[in-house]
């Protein structure tokens, strides 16, 4: 049984996203004083007095405008309305009733879900009720005076909202949840890929051929197999010189935050355009954050192929995106659905490697093999580097400490060699691994090694 959905609807710039953030207790939706910032449907969980529900923010409704996105926004609002158990119709209490409010009210009138009018931006208690009363004229019942930005009046609104929602609550399911962020340049097909992963009749992200359609980092919960996935679609990351101050700049910040939130990051590349600096920068941020990663080559259906094409692309990806050369590569088409299911498999495998713990005995066997193939470097004065033993100290990502006689002897080249040998012996595809080199006198190292013998 799904949680009841509450749709937030209204014309542009009346404070719908601010109300969403207030009800959900966070700041997930981008809030900016400019009409049309929200375009997709953005779902967030909310709770009031123990009653749980989902709130969905929608794009601003305008019925006479030539902007290319408006038919798509209206389609998204229609879908939100169709699945909603109740509607919060948000108006600007300071501005009073506008022609746009009347159009939205007429559009809502006679529809199935109960409608609550939210007269927003009423920060002054002495005038809030009188200003809100004007909205009785819309013929949709009692208006609730609130200030979404300060929170005043939201308690009464939530009491009224919960009263009209279904009384039965679904039992909480304890499926394990993975947070998966979908990142990439604008227009590489991230939203189309999200919609393909979600499936179903009504996609949650708006898909358009205009770059930069998605501005928020949008959370969508999907159950697949024995696991729940929190899929986070993000705004495409452009070069800094192409991003103005405003909602798109905020979207880039949210995308970077989404990487940090994720257990696994899906980096989407357009097969028809190849690798750009933005992908390299994203790969560096993923590796720096220590997140598991899956590389998805989208629009694979648009490529002319022969027997060697896939291997060529895979090699190029790993060469160009060397920060995440350990990531698996999935070739897919969000448009046709080709190999979309394999993305879930790759995400699961990467998450498993990210959480993996290796016994001390197996770890040190791999270490000894690496040392046999290539001895540690020596200093110019002839001091030989020594690696005494290794132990794992963390997961997410797997982190290993190597105890050595002198950390200065182990330069970047040899450290990369050891990582390559460990990966060759132990795997860890899809996950970064981290090595910490610690200096220790030989006698003390041998004594400690005996204490930590095979686990």
From Swiss-Prot:
Membrane-spanning residues where?
A: none
**Residues where GTP 2 binds:** 184-191, 233-237, 298-301
Locate the EngA-type G domain: which residues? 4-169, 178-355
Q: What PROSITE patterns does the annotation carry? A: G_ENGA
The record's Gene Ontology biological-process terms are: ribosome biogenesis
Q: Where is the KH-like domain?
A: 356-441
Highest rank taxon of the organism: Bacteria
UniProt keywords, alphabetically:
GTP-binding, Nucleotide-binding, Repeat, Ribosome biogenesis
**Keyword Ribonucleoprotein on this protein?**
no
Recorded GO MF terms: ATP hydrolysis activity; GTP binding; ribosome binding
Q: Which residues bind GTP 1?
A: 10-17, 57-61, 120-123
* Family statement: Belongs to the TRAFAC class TrmE-Era-EngA-EngB-Septin-like GTPase superfamily. EngA (Der) GTPase family.
NCBIfam families named in the record: GTPase_EngA (TIGR03594), small_GTP (TIGR00231)
What does this protein's UniProt record list under function? GTPase that plays an essential role in the late steps of ribosome biogenesis.
> What is said about its interaction partners and assembly?
Associates with the 50S ribosomal subunit.
Q: Per its record, how is this protein called by name?
A: GTPase Der
What organism does the record attribute this protein to? Answer: Gloeobacter violaceus (strain ATCC 29082 / PCC 7421)
Q: Which gene encodes it?
A: der
């Amino acid at each position: 049984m799904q949680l009841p959905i509450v749709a937030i609807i209204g014309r542009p710039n009346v404070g719908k996203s601010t109300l969403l953030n207030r009800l959900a207790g966070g700041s997930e939706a981008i809030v900016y004083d400019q009409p049309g910032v929200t375009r997709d449907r953005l779902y967030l969980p909310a709770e009031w007095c123990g009653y749980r529900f989902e709130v969905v923010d929608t794009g601003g409704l305008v019925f006479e405008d030539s902007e290319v996105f408006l038919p798509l926004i209206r389609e998204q609002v229609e879908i939100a309305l169709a699945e909603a158990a109740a509607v919060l119709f948000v108006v600007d209490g300071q501005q009073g009733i506008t022609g746009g409010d009347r159009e939205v009210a007429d559009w809502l009138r006679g529809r199935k879900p109960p409608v609550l009018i939210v007269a927003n931006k009423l920060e002054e208690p002495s005038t809030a009720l009188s200003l809100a009363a004007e909205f009785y004229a819309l013929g949709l019942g009692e208006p609730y005076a609130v200030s979404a930005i300060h929170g005043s009046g939201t308690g009464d609104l939530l009491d009224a909202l919960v009263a009209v929602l279904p009384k039965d609550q679904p039992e909480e399911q304890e499926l394990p949840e993975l947070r998966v962020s979908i990142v990439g340049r604008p227009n590489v097909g991230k939203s189309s890929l999200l919609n393909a992963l979600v499936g179903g009749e009504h996609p949650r992200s708006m898909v358009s051929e205009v770059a930069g359609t998605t501005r928020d980092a949008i959370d969508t919960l999907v159950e697949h197999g024995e696991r729940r996935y929190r899929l986070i679609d993000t705004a495409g990351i452009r070069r800094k010189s192409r991003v103005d101050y405003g909602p798109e700049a905020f979207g880039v910040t949210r995308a970077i935050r989404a990487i940090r939130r994720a257990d696994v990051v899906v980096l989407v590349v357009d097969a028809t355009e190849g690798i750009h600096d933005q992908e390299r920068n994203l790969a560096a941020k993923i590796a720096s954050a220590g997140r598991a990663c899956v590389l998805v080559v989208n629009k694979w259906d648009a490529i002319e192929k022969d027997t060697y094409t896939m291997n060529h692309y895979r090699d190029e990806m790993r060469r160009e995106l060397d920060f995440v050369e350990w990531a698996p590569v999935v070739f897919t088409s969000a448009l046709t659905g080709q190999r979309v299911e394999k993305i879930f498999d790759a995400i699961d495998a990467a998450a498993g490697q990210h959480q993996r713990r290796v016994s001390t005995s197996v770890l040190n066997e791999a270490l000894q093999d690496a040392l046999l193939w290539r001895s540690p470097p020596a200093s110019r004065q002839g001091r030989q580097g020594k690696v005494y033993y290794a132990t794992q100290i963390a997961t997410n990502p797997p982190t290993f400490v190597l105890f050595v006689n002198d950390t200065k002897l182990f330069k970047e080249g040899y450290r990369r060699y050891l990582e390559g040998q460990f990966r060759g012996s132990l795997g860890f595809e899809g996950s970064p691994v981290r090595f910490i080199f610690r200096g220790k006198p030989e006698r003390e190292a041998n004594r400690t090694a005996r204490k930590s013998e095979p686990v």
